Amino acid sequence: MSQINIVENKPALLIDIRLDNKLSKILVISDLHVGSTYWSQNNDIALDWYHITSEIESELSDMAISNKVDSIVLLGDIKNNIFKVVKDDWNLIPKLLHSLSAICQVYLIPGNHDSKIGLVTPENIHLMGVKGMVLGDILFTHGHTFPSELRSNINKIIMGHIHPTFFRENSVLNGQKIWVFLKVKKDAIFPSSKGSLEIVMLPSYNKYVYGNHRMKIKRTNSPILKKILRKDIIEKCLIVSIDGTILGNENLLGEVFNSSL
């Protein structure tokens, strides 16, 4: 069994999970998008990625140390350039990963932006497959691939990829990052299984990567979303702000995804 908690005012999770008869604490983040020239160009902002990456490194190190975590799980899209490793990646990513690995074990699950990420990943980082990994009863995955039926023994999916964002005109929360917590019918993902499956969708950790009306999420961005965003599949839903305020239930999903249920 596992216990999942959000980090107050941060798009990060702390998970207590029993592994090999020992309680382990895991810090989970997603979607750093280091060197995000695409995002900066579309928002007309000049960004200093050396400063931003140092800021992320400092924040994650402080969280890992203060919470005495045993490991950090990075849920993908560490870099932003989809097709290649660019100069900023060579300069920034190894330093970030090396710094975190000096504190605890680090697991990196590649996302759709992480092609050739192995070229800039230090040897002491646990580089996993794109399908993710299982710890205890949880599947950790980026969210751009569909889970294998072989993973059907899990009870929870923790994923990134979609950058969940709240959209409502004239709302103070319009364009703000949010958490999405779902309980769905398990057979929507694992047809041979009965019961329920919990799914947690992480916001992007990078505070400069955010949503606007031009980037509204489509359910087809993730094969997992495509299967579960239906009224007859969703059993329970909580939409939660970064500070932990509950904003609503499944009735607000239309404010997050570019379609109604």
Task: Go through the PLM ranges and name each one.
Residues M1-L261:
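Extended recognition/assembly regions associated with phosphoester-bond processing machinery
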